[in-house]
Structure formats: C-alpha cells, structure tokens
C-alpha cells in the first residue's frame, strides 16, 4: 500500500495530505484499485476514471456531514477507500464482504444506496430539501455520468430542481463525462455533450469577456451590463441549446476531470453558489491503466484478471445463455425481415452486438430508457414488426407500467428476452433477477417461458417469434446447463415437459434451476425415493392439464424457482390446487422474502435452500 494512502484510515483524513502530493495520492489509489480488483473482480474502469473527482470532493467537503450521491454507484470504490474501508477491499463483492455499491448499512458516509441508473439527482434533491427544511447548511452533491443522463428520471429531477433556484438554495451536480455508460453512449444528449466538449470552457470564456469589457475606458462597463442582460442569446450562440442553464441550473465547465487542483477550485466555487449548479468534468474511463483505457467496455465490470496482460484468469470455456440468445437471434433474423432488436444502452451485456453487426438498420439502442424501450417496441409491433427487447431482469422492472399498459392490454407481439434472471452473484441486491415471475406472471395476455438448458432456448425463441402476442423468456447469467439434452419435446404453448416419472413426490422445476433439481432427484433416488421431475417451461399459461394429472398421482408436489416466493410460480400452483379443491401437500422452494446480498450464485442458492442438497433435504424432511 502507498505511503500516503496508508495515512488515510478515517473519513476526512485526506485533508492532512499536503496539496502538492495530491497527484501522488491519486497514483497510489489507482495502484490500490488495480491490485485489489484484479484479484476480486469488480467495476474497474469507471473507478479509475473517477479518482480525482472523488478526491476533490473529500478534500472540499466534510463527511458524513456533507452528502454525496453516486449515480449507479459502481464508481464509489474511491469513496469507500477514503472513508476508512480500504482494509476490507480483499472482500469486495464476496459473501459477507464489502459491497460493490454504496450501502447505507455499511457506512454513514454512504448517504444513499444506488445500483440502477439516473437516480442520483432525485435523491440528492430530496436530501437538499430536507436539509433546508431543517435549516442546516451542509453541502449536497450528485455525481452522475453522461450515460445516466440518457435516462428519463434524470430529466424529471433536473426539471424539479427549479424549486432550489427559486429559494436560492445550493445543490451541486458533477457531470462525470467520459463519453460512455457501459458501452458508448447514444442519442441526442450524447451529441449535445460531444458538442460541448469541442468548445472552449464556457465559464472561462464568460469571465474573460466580462473582464476585458470592464477594462475598456468609458464604454466597457456599459457594454458589459448590456452583455449580461442579453446573456441568454450569447450563451445560445456559443453553447448550442444551453440545456442546463435553460432549466435553471448554472453551468460550470469544461473542467479537466483529472486535474485535482482545477476540480478543487470548481467545487469550492460551486459551494458558494446560490441555487443548483452543474460542474461539467471531462474524464477518461480506465484512466491510468492502458488496458482499460484501450478497452473500457471490457473493464467496466470484470472478473479477476492478470494485471500485466489484462487477461481474465478464468477463461470462458462454455457458451453462456447470452451467447446462445445472440447466435439464435441472428440466425432467426436472416429469414424474418420483421425482426428488430432493441437494447437500453447494453448491446454487449445483452448479446446484441452481433445482431447490430449483421443487421444495423434493424438494431436500436435507445439509451438508458427502459420505459421508452418498451413502448417504442409496442409501436413497432403495432405496425407489423416483431420487436425483441433484450434487457436485464432487474432493469425491466423500470418498464412495468409500459409492459402492462402499452403491450399487454393491446396484445402486441413484443418479445421480451430477460437476461440475468434469477440469482446473479456478486452484484448483489440491486441486480438480482428474482422478481420477474412476480411482476410479469399476473399480467393478462402475457406468456412467460423459461428454458431448462441451452438446447431448449433456441426452440423457445423460434416459438416466441411465431407467436402473435406479448411473450417473455427468462434466462440466467452464466454458462448454459448442458444436461438433459436428450429431452427435447416440441415447444407448445402452455405445455410442460415430463423428464422423469415417479411415485412419491414430483418436482416442478422452473428454468435453469433444473441443473440443481436433476441432482436432487439423483440424491433422492440414492436414498430409496422415487421422485418425478417436470420441466415447467411455461410459467404462464400454466399447464393445467398436467397439473391435474400430477395432483391425482403424487401426494407431494414441490416447486423450485429462482424467484421471490411471494407472487412466484409456487403460489400460482397453490392457487390452482386450492381453486380446484385438490388437497395435495405442496412445498414451494425459492427466495423467501428477503433481498439477496452479494456472494457467488452457489452460495446464494445454498442460502435460499435451492441447491441440490438443500432441495433433497427439504423433500425428505417434508415426507417424514
């Protein structure tokens, strides 16, 4: 650990560092990040790019009295280091270890938990208004990336900031502009910021012009006053749109986001401003590590890697579900010109980069805008196209109203491909995909499927793209399950697949948890039990004919799902049995009413009781 960094053990210790040594401290922090994240994995590039911004905030502010909200939160590692948590970095994103995002229960310096995009300005505004109501004078800051500004919630908050301008109350927004979210940014805001980057600093320009005019004998001050009165037209001339100032937010920029002294000057000046102010800082994602600078997308979120080469320590040997989705969609689109693909700023994560390569005119990246993406897809479907929206399960939550109102009520053929469904591992509570059955399974007209393995997935996709109505397929993060490939009954609407006939108990497996259920069956067989096993396939509509057969045959029915039990598949089966006056014993296994913290997927399954050993044990306990 670096000599300077070793002196920082508590919040505000950075203030004891000599200002002339700030650049040295920045180097030590980057070295610390590389040493640790290369071993644990995590979000690297964004943190390397935010070192000086975070240092400047901790130099200018006092924690925990002052409040900083980090949008998305994956760039908060430096904040954690500077608030006394650096010794815990060996546990980053591991079970019972340091969280990869701000977490209120972890430190009082983490004033607001984040994980999803575009929330920081709203949260910071709430903190600022509460401050003013309590007549306090602490500083409130929102740190937001240029990618997050493509999210509609950010604009709603910017619009609402006028309440602070009216009262002349301070709040600082730092725009960390690195031209990227995870992938390169798209859309009008991206073009607007690109235009700003190409121009001289507006703040510097304004000050220099006013100073020069004031020094002209006789007429200078008069001209300066006239210029001030017509500042709106001057701004429009030199900075097209002046979006932020037109919304009542003072714009300060451009600032070099890697010049610690320039940042300190900007923040100290912003603290004195009456009203909301935005500091536009230009940064480089992956700054200080050549491998990340060259490929910031790869190092956005990465597993353990070799620091010298930048190569992952554990090389991918199997195809992932995302890979299978990507290859299948490209193949299906070859003979179906109506297939179009949509992503919300995640072409790489969702596997749509290959689709973009082959069918660029049928590919749409709408930015961080899930609500818009769903209704945009609905519009495409209304005109005869067959849109495929590939999205992470935890992010589709943001488009719930649009799924219900704009797609399902109108029975429009939108295909939702829900990646990262189920347990996702190290990203923790904010990214778990354990609610999609609950928030989609109750919507009329929605069809919801889950493949048991990689072989079944393309067949479900083919079925979905021939289906004339709303349909969704959920699948997990990680390598495909290759077992049970000999079981490949045709995919039919609302029909499940019987894997094993049995006698004592039947297990209904939802999706890729089949891997654990098949192992559990083997454990039970070894102990003398005769379990049946069913691949549910269709969560909605349920295979009611098969359920009647199972209820007549098996005294114990077990459902297993990587979903919250409340509103999950098990409750659907329970409702069916009750409605039809069956009295079978029902055991539902899944996530039992808690947010799943960061750990490995295997550890999370064990905690939930849905690993093979736990499933078998629960069944034996229930039968005895």
Locate the predicted segments by residue.
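Non-catalytic terminal/interface segments that mediate subunit docking, oligomerization
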Residues: 67, 283-397, 402-412, 469, ...
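N-terminal amphipathic, basic-rich helices that act as targeting or association modules
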Residues: 1-81, 245, 249-263, 280-283
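Glycine-/acidic-rich phosphate or pyrophosphate-binding loops and their flanking alpha/beta elements
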Residues: 265-268, 300-301, 320-335, 351-357, ...
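A glycine-rich helix N-cap at a beta->alpha junction
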Residues: 88-98, 163-178, 201-204, 408-420
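Peripheral docking tails and interdomain loops at the edges
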Residues: 304-308, 312-317, 425-427, 446-447, ...
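Cofactor-binding active-site loop characterized by glycine-rich and histidine/acidic residues
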Residues: 43-167, 321, 339, 343-344, ...
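Long, well-ordered, tryptophan-enriched scaffold segments
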Residues: 4-5, 178-325
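Structural signature of the thiamine diphosphate
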Residues: 223-291, 413-418, 437-486, 612-624
């Amino acid at each position: 650990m670096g000599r300077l960094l070793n002196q920082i053990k508590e919040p505000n210790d950075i203030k004891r560092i000599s200002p002339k040594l700030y650049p040295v401290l920045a180097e030590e922090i980057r070295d610390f990040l590389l040493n640790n994240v290369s071993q644990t994995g995590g979000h690297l590039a964004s943190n390397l790019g935010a070192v000086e911004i975070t240092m400047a905030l901790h130099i200018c502010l006092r924690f925990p009295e002052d409040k900083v909200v980090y949008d998305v939160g994956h760039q908060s590692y430096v904040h954690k280091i500077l608030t006394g948590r650096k010794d815990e970095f060996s546990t980053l994103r591991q079970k019972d270890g340091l969280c990869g995002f701000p977490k209120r229960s972890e430190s009082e310096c983490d004033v607001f938990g984040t994980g999803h995009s575009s929330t920081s300005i709203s949260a910071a505004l709430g903190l600022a208004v509460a401050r003013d109501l309590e007549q306090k004078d602490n500083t409130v800051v929102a740190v937001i990336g240029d990618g997050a500004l493509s999210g509609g919630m950010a604009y709603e908050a910017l619009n609402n900031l006028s309440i602070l301008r009216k009262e002349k109350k301070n709040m600082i927004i730092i725009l960390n502009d690195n031209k990227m979210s995870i992938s390169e940014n798209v859309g009008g805001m991206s073009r607007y910021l690109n235009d700003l980057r190409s121009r001289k600093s507006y703040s510097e320009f304004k000050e220099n012009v006013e100073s020069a005019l004031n020094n002209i004998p006789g007429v200078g001050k008069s001209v300066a006053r006239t210029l001030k009165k017509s500042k709106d037209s001057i701004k429009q001339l030199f900075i097209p749109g002046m979006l932020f100032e037109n919304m009542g937010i003072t714009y300060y920029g451009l600032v070099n986001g890697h010049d610690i002294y320039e940042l300190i000057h900007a923040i100290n000046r912003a603290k004195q401003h009456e009203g909301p102010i935005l500091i536009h800082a230009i940064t480089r994602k992956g700054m200080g590590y050549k491998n990340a600078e060259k490929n910031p997308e790869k190092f956005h979120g990465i597993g353990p890697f070799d620091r010298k080469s930048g190569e992952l320590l554990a090389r991918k040997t199997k195809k992932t579900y995302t890979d299978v989705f990507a290859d299948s969609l490209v193949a299906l689109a070859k003979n179906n010109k109506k297939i179009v693909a949509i992503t919300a700023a995640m072409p790489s994560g969702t596997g749509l980069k290959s689709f973009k390569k082959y069918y660029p005119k049928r590919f749409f990246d709408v930015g961080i805008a899930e609500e818009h993406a769903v209704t945009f897809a609905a519009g495409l479907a209304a005109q005869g196209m067959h849109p495929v929206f590939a999205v992470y399960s935890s992010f589709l939550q943001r488009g719930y109203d649009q799924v219900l109102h704009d797609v399902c009520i109108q029975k429009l053929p939108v295909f939702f491909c829900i990646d990262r469904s189920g347990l996702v591992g190290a990203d923790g509570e904010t990214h778990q995909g354990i609610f999609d059955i609950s928030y989609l399974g109750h919507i009329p007209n929605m069809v919801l499927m889950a493949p048991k393995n990689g072989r079944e997935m393309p067949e479900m996709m083919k079925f979905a793209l021939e289906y004339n109505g709303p349909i969704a397929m959920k699948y997990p993060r990680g390598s495909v399950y290759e077992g049970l490939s000999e079981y490949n009954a045709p995919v039919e609407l609302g029909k499940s697949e019987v894997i094993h006939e049995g006698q004592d108990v039947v297990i209904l497996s939802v999706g890729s948890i089949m891997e654990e259920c098949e192992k559990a069956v083997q454990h039970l067989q070894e102990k003398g039990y005769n379990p049946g096993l069913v691949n549910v396939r269709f969560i909605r509509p349920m295979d009611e004919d098969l359920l009647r057969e199972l209820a007549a045959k098996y005294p114990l029915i077990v459902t297993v799902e990587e979903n919250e039990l409340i509103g999950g598949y098990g409750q659907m089966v329970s409702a069916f049995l009750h409605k039809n006056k069956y009295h079978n014993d029902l055991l539902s296994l899944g996530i039992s009413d808690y947010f799943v913290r960061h750990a490995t997927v295997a550890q999370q399954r064990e905690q939930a009781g849905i690993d093979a050993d736990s499933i078998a044990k629960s069944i034996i306990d229930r039968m005895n």
